[in-house]
């Protein structure tokens, strides 16, 4: 899901080394839930962090050398081990959350990933055909309790000639940026083009953008669905 923002709203939340990468004069912020399946370079699974729900809140940036990429405001994941490795090794703002994701590319709720006592953030039982349900509630480090619940209906696949410049702008990104204190890092990513499907948001109660300091504009967001592709992530490098 993607929302347009005034560039000044987003720029105020970026490090000075990065600038908003605008499309038709607007900054864009995306909320992206998905299932993460982790493997080593040789294709081995990682037992303590192999398959789990994850979601990120991100925007689109360009550095001082003109290289385009993604800046993450937050990355919520249901595996504490994966969160610790990503925070320490990649300096990315990973957070441990109770998460559920079900539907065409989702996972049933699993022990250790559910929200525990109290109201469940979702999903509710029995998603319909072509429907995804997702829920999360942040555990650590905070702001604790930041949550999201959504339901998305999936439509027909896009043909290549039906995709426009904005679709490519939002999905074709090859560099991730992070900054922790004085350390600024860029991480290269490579993947095939995402196969995209039409999607419609049927229900959305989101607090993850608000936790990042952003209030979505009124109206329905632009939405895509993808069954996914393999993504290779490089080592962190200093970018400036």
Indicate where each model-derived feature is located:
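Short N-terminal helix-initiation segments at or just after the protein's N-terminus
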Residues: 1-8, 43, 167-177
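N-terminal domain-onset segments
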Residues: 1-41, 194-204, 217, 225-228, ...
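Short, surface-exposed linear patches
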Residues: 21-25, 43, 52, 81-83, ...
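Long, hydrophobic/aromatic-enriched structural stretches that serve as scaffold segments
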Residues: 24-27, 32-65
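Internal, well-folded beta-alpha domain core
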Residues: 56-240
């Amino acid at each position: 899901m993607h929302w347009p923002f005034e560039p000044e709203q987003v720029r105020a939340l970026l490090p000075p080394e990065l600038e908003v990468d605008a499309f038709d004069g607007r900054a864009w912020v995306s909320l992206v839930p998905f299932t993460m399946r982790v493997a080593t370079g040789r294709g081995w699974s990682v037992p303590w962090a192999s398959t789990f729900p994850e979601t990120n809140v991100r925007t689109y940036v360009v550095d001082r050398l003109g290289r385009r990429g993604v800046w993450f405001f937050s990355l919520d994941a249901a595996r504490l081990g994966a969160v610790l490795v990503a925070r320490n090794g990649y300096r990315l703002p990973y957070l441990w959350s109770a998460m559920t994701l079900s539907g065409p590319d989702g996972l049933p709720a699993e022990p250790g990933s559910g929200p525990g006592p109290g109201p469940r953030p979702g999903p509710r039982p029995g998603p319909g055909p072509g429907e995804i349900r997702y829920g999360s509630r942040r555990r650590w480090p905070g702001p604790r309790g930041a949550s999201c619940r959504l339901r998305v209906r999936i439509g027909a696949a896009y043909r290549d000639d039906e995709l426009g410049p904005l679709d490519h702008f939002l999905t074709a990104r090859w560099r991730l940026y992070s900054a922790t204190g004085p350390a600024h890092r860029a991480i290269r990513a490579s993947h095939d083009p995402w196969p995209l499907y039409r999607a419609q948001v049927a229900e959305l109660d989101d607090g993850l953008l608000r936790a990042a300091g952003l209030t979505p504009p009124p109206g329905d967001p632009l939405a895509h669905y993808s069954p996914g592709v393999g993504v290779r992530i490089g080592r962190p490098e200093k970018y400036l």
